Swiss-Prot record:
Protein name listed in UniProt: Probable transcriptional regulatory protein Adeh_2184
Organism name: Anaeromyxobacter dehalogenans (strain 2CP-C)
GO terms of biological process kind: regulation of DNA-templated transcription
Main location: cytoplasm
Protein family (similarity comment): Belongs to the TACO1 family.
Gene3D superfamilies, A to Z: 1.10.10.200, 3.30.70.980
UniProt keyword annotations, A-Z: Cytoplasm, DNA-binding, Transcription, Transcription regulation
Xref: InterPro entries: Integrase-like_N (IPR017856), TACO1_YebC-like_2nd/3rd_dom (IPR048300), TACO1_YebC_N (IPR049083), Transcrip_reg_TACO1-like (IPR002876), Transcrip_reg_TACO1-like_dom3 (IPR026564), YebC-like (IPR029072)
Length: 240
């Protein structure tokens, strides 16, 4: 077949694996949201947010509906959200957010990933002080008067707003608020019928650090290993 075919095949499988991981993460988010607020998105802001993220990822509707149905059943696995902390190589701080039905398995796996990739897992609070938990919304910027929107949303918890680049190279408007204002800002955006692409809580690094390319690659190897773990939902770090 040749090298070009093998390269394309590897790229295709990598894309499929990434998509499968994203769908698994969304399914867990659905289970947690339904358990916390019921299966009706009209009455469950957390579920509305997750369904919004599912649409942004092009998760098939039948998979979304199946996840809601499973989450509504009595035999649905109960997931516990647990956050682990540690250091990657070269002192980079890492926060690992998991959703697990077996904490013993998860903590062992997370510790193994740190150890096998030159890092070390820490105790609760060992690196959390270097991050701030925030609500982060990503919007399509087309048709938005950003100055007017910023003034409008300040009273609803808005703290930061600016343009960024999405995974496909598209322009994205990023809005941040304190985690405590997440629900208030979500309601304000919904009321204004803005095109919100995704919204999540994130641990935002307060002081990002820069490393030479080779050292940064070592850090990202740990991040990649953690992200591939079935129990890991998100990995946050302070590498610039």
């Amino acid at each position: 077949m040749g090298r070009i075919f093998e390269t394309r095949k590897a790229t295709m499988f990598a894309r499929w694996n990434k998509m499968a991981k994203a769908f698994t993460r969304i399914s867990k988010d659905i289970a947690i949201a339904v358990k916390g607020g019921g299966p009706n998105p009209d009455n469950n802001p957390a579920l509305r947010r997750v369904l919004q993220n599912a649409r942004h990822l092009n998760m098939p509707k039948d998979k979304v509906e199946a996840a809601i149905k499973r989450a509504s059943g009595q035999d649905q696995q109960a997931y516990e959200v647990v956050v682990y902390e540690g250091y990657a190589p070269h002192g980079v701080a890492v926060m690992v957010e998991t959703a697990t039905d077996n904490v013993v398995r998860t903590v062992a796996n997370v510790r193994m990933h740190f150890k096998n990739n030159g890092g070390n897992m820490g105790n609760t609070g060992s690196v959390a002080f270097q991050f701030r938990r925030m609500g982060v919304f990503r919007l399509a910027p087309e048709g938005i008067d950003q100055d007017a929107l910023e003034l409008d949303l300040i009273d609803h918890g808005l703290e930061e707003m600016g343009e960024s680049t999405g995974e496909k190279g598209e322009k994205v408007l990023v809005i941040r608020c304190a985690f405590e204002s997440f629900g208030q800002l979500q309601a304000a955006l919904e009321q204004r019928k803005l095109n919100v692409l995704s919204s999540e809580s994130e641990y935002v690094a307060q002081t990002p650090v820069q490393l030479p390319e080779e050292q940064a690659r070592e850090v990202l190897e740990l991040v990649d290993a953690l992200e591939q773990d079935e129990d890991v939902q998100h990995v946050f770090h302070n590498l610039a």
